Amino acid sequence: GILSIASSLLGAKHVYSYDLDEVAVKSTKANRELNNLTGKITVSQNDLLKNVQQKANVIVSNILAEILLLLIDDAWDNLYDNGYFITSGIITSKHNLVEDKLKDKGFKIIETKTKDDWVSIVAQK
């Protein structure tokens, strides 16, 4: 949703936006129209990156750690070499769990930021 709009407005050539929630998909499509980004953002209802074959330079996700852990393998598979996986929505108590899974998969942790009880991680393939 908002991450795809922001990515496009910040210069991404094309954005593929996936969400499981039908309401979120409809909202993203409406916001895409409001921001005149129809040709720049493809919006689909999907369960994380399951069965997605599209490669990306950057994958951005703002979801809870438990769901993020399920996404890491597919994120690796869908990133080009040296691509970035930017995650947020991780509660501090789950930070090490997520970071360890990223490292185990082969990601290099580039940056970690914490604000209050929330963590974001930038990892590179």
Feature-to-residue mapping (PLM):
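Core SAM-dependent methyltransferase catalytic element
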Residues: 107-125
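A short hydrophobic/small-residue beta-strand
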Residues: 14-15, 85-86, 109
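Residue-level signal for inorganic ion chemistry
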Residues: 28, 64, 102
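Short strand-turn motif at the edge of the Rossmann-like AdoMet-binding core
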Residues: 87-92
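A short glycine-rich, Lys/Arg-flanked "PGG" loop and its adjoining helix->strand segment in the class I
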Residues: 69-84, 99
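Conserved short alpha-helix immediately C-terminal to the canonical SAM/SAH-binding motif I
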Residues: 23-27, 67, 94
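Conserved SAM/SAH cofactor-binding pocket of Class I
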Residues: 1-48, 52
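Hydrophobic beta-strand segment of the Class I
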Residues: 58-61
